[in-house]
Structure formats: structure tokens, C-alpha cells
């Protein structure tokens, strides 16, 4: 049974500008240590920005699917976006005992990154 659906689109230059303006302070406020570490596999700044833009969109799409938004119960770094062994994007929630499954699709093209999240339980 589908419990929630969320989507978000991010203007990639916005993430680039925030990173240039606030540096690692911005990264640590929004992304987990794992996401920051994973970005280091890209030697090109633009590829790193796309990496972060897709993860930003995924976090926004997730809270839209849950219906809570960000706040006291969940912070952006608690939502960890990574890839499984086959390269499929996935979301894990830090310090959470969620009782539903999460499906994530992310993509980027030129100046935009998009994410789509579906929350569901098995019948």
C-alpha cells in the first residue's frame, strides 16, 4: 500500500552558489558525513555539485512524501542518500525505526536535479 509520494526539483547553480558562499558549513548542515565522503570520488567540482543537488532534491522529496517537512523530528543530515552495490539510489534515515519501505529515483540534466520518492508497505 502506498503511504506517500514526494517529488522535488533543484536548480543546480543554487547548490553551487550556497557551497561557494558558505563552504563546508553548508555541506555539514545539509548532508551526512557519508554523503560528503561519497562526493570525494568526483574530482570535478561540477560533478560534486550535481552529486549534492540530487541528494538535496531527494531529501526534500522524502519529507514531502512523509508529510512532515523538516523540523525537530528530522534534520537534513538524518536523511542519508547513497547508492547500493548495483548503483541504485537509496534513502536511509539515521536513528529511525521506520516501518515502511522507501523507493527513490534521482536524475539530473543540465541545470536541474530531480528526485521522486514513494513510501509503501507490503500487503
Swiss-Prot record:
Keywords: Cytoplasm, Fatty acid biosynthesis, Fatty acid metabolism, Lipid biosynthesis, Lipid metabolism, Magnesium, Metal-binding, Transferase. One of its GO terms (biological process) is lysine biosynthetic process via aminoadipic acid. GO terms for molecular function: holo-[acyl-carrier-protein] synthase activity; magnesium ion binding. InterPro entries: 4-PPantetheinyl_Trfase_dom (IPR008278), 4-PPantetheinyl_Trfase_dom_sf (IPR037143), ACPS (IPR002582), P-Pant_transferase_sf (IPR050559), Ppantetheine-prot_Trfase_dom (IPR004568). It catalyses: apo-[ACP] + CoA = holo-[ACP] + adenosine 3',5'-bisphosphate + H(+). One of its GO terms (cellular component) is cytosol. It is found in: Cytoplasm. Mg(2+) binds at residues 8, 60. SUPFAM superfamilies: 4'-phosphopantetheinyl transferase. This is Holo-[acyl-carrier-protein] synthase. Its cofactor is Mg(2+). Belongs to the P-Pant transferase superfamily. AcpS family.
